[in-house]
């Protein structure tokens, strides 16, 4: 792989048996720290789900070690070049599940999952009639970017998806179902759940959006916006042929691809907004959050009560 930037961001997962996740997590954290990697890795009895950053040399050593562990035989790393670290710290945490569905009867993707479609096949399938495309991500991920014509489930977390499907089953009945997520891990379980629910024609994008955007043949075509990623980059491009902005500023509705967290720590909602509107609205999604005594924007910028009052007055005057 030709390298032009000094750092890399790795994204990977694998459903495989890890007998003692707590012990593995502690040892793996020590190993990652010895390589000076930064990132976030989740470990469960059902496998591993990680994203981390480091120099080319550090990430090469990490991938080599993982490939040499028989538990991770066949693991696939999605690699992005970067100018620096994409994370501030290194976390390796044991979890009950790699992705939180909290099903009473869990799905094992080795036993049941939807058909895997490579990017070109997924591209062709999206253009067919009687096909529904379901985004298996959260609402704020969809709002930044999605495939043309994809359905946005009204959910704030992955575990809400099965209930949404049951409440909206008329949308799916008799249709070919395509589903996708960032790197593929959520769809492994979600597509398997759909099959178990009785849907007969269920396919998933193999390798997720990240792989689709890098595919030399499809080049991210039929994707609008950017792809939300869970690191300091926040967003990465997908469509190499055209860039259509689908994100809308929380306050004005204007095209926007800049995410911030609401300044009220009790809310912390992700909102799309310009730098100008961040300042104007004190980085708060609502009036209640603007006047919160814990508003981080107010504290960070050391705004006086008079300055906050003036900002609130200006917002009222503009309504």
UniProtKB/Swiss-Prot annotation:
InterPro entries in the cross-refs: Rhodanese-like_dom, Rhodanese-like_dom_sf, Rhodanese_C, TrhO, TRHO_N
CDD domains the UniProt entry points to: RHOD_YceA
SUPFAM superfamilies per the UniProt record, alphabetical: Rhodanese/Cell cycle control phosphatase
GO biological process: one example: tRNA modification
Catalytic activity: uridine(34) in tRNA + AH2 + O2 = 5-hydroxyuridine(34) in tRNA + A + H2O
Catalytic-site annotation from UniProt: 181 (cysteine persulfide intermediate)
EC number: 1.14.-.-
Record-annotated Rhodanese domain positions: 127-221
Signal peptide stretch: none
Keyword tags: Oxidoreductase, tRNA processing
Gene Ontology MF term list: oxidoreductase activity, acting on paired donors, with incorporation or reduction of molecular oxygen
PROSITE patterns: RHODANESE_3 (PS50206)
Alphabetical list of Pfam families matching this protein: Rhodanese, Rhodanese_C, UPF0176_N
Stored HAMAP family: TrhO (MF_00469)
Family to which the UniProt record says this protein belongs: Belongs to the TrhO family.
Cited function: Catalyzes oxygen-dependent 5-hydroxyuridine (ho5U) modification at position 34 in tRNAs.
NCBIfam families named among the record's database cross-references: PRK00142.1-3
Annotated protein name in UniProt: tRNA uridine(34) hydroxylase
Species of provenance: Bacillus cereus (strain ZK / E33L)
